[in-house]
Amino acid sequence: MTPNIYQQLGLKKVINACGKMTILGVSSVAPEVMQATARAASAFVEIDALVEKTGELVSRYTGAEDSYITSCASAGIAIAVAAAITHGDRARVALMPDSSGMANEVVMLRGHNVDYGAPVTSAIRLGGGRIVEVGSSNLATRWQLESAINEKTAALLYVKSHHCVQKGMLSIDDFVQVAQANHLPLIVDAAAEEDLRGWVASGADMVIYSGAKAFNAPTSGFITGRKTWIAACKAQHQGIARAMKIGKENMVGLVYALENYHQGQTTVTAAQLQPVAEAISAIHGLYADIEQDEAGRAIWRIRVRVNASELGLNAQDVEAQLRGGEIAIYARKYQLHQGVFSLDPRTVAEGEMALIVARLREIAEHAAD
């Protein structure tokens, strides 16, 4: 097998069965998207005009009034928060992230206060926001959301993520209704979501996506929504967004990646994964089945349960050996403490699932020696 470019640099080969994670480079970009990126990198353009044109093109896919491409989804959160606080006023933009004396509170659910590799609160603070949590970790009510709003409130933030608490939380409809009743912008962090239109259609004012996750774009993100608020986002380029700027090549790459996505993506079904699950279950001490994404997306994964008493190793041991081999195999490890890890097929290249099964078999055989 021909070494990839990272192996040529002296780094390990990685099999990514973890999903579209930043720590592993997020996603694999299609050749035609990279070709567009290369062409964009080799020419000059008026950046302001490119910002407007790419915003228009992105909005064709989202159904929004306008859009603004960012360097990543995390930058999008900071920029959207700054937009909500400053309303695009140049004097205020120049002061950010110092929002002293401004309405700067961002109201969110405690069950949505997550860490995706960095705390979401870091991005909010970077945009000048002060976090106001609503509810408890496992339950939030409409009256709690309403009572958190005052003259210092700048925006409401709704986070849609598999990291969030999935039960006992308020719905997007609750947030839309409360935001509109109080004439406040609603920001939705939909970084890894695949539905380009639903969140805008729900009534959100600024919806943030990662370009590199669901859409397999080069490193990028975008904010899509109401024209007045997107204009306020664009104004941040003369403030905090300058340190988060994205290059012309990745702006073009995102547009081409969205076109690819719009034309249709191949998905791995539960039925297609079943033979792999059966092969893993044939290994002593391992039991595999198929699970759907915890946030309800149409994503199917193989869940592997480790019987430590049978195998002689616990789930943490197996995951560590997968990662520590000659080929580093990364699995999803959110449930390791429950004796479970998962394999996400979306980022596994052809032939690599067989290598994963073979490595699991090897680990089990060595444990039996």
From Swiss-Prot:
EC number: 4.3.1.29
N6-(pyridoxal phosphate)lysine PTM positions: 213
Needed cofactors: pyridoxal 5'-phosphate
Pfam families the UniProt entry points to: SelA
Catalytic activity: 2-amino-2-deoxy-D-gluconate 6-phosphate = 2-dehydro-3-deoxy-6-phospho-D-gluconate + NH4(+)
Transmembrane segments: none
Signal peptide feature range: none
Top EC category: lyase
Entry-linked InterPro entries: DgaE-like, PyrdxlP-dep_Trfase, PyrdxlP-dep_Trfase_major, SelA-like
PANTHER family reported for this sequence: L-SERYL-TRNA(SEC) SELENIUM TRANSFERASE (PTHR32328:SF0)
Name of the molecule in the record: D-glucosaminate-6-phosphate ammonia lyase
Organism: Salmonella typhimurium (strain 14028s / SGSC 2262)
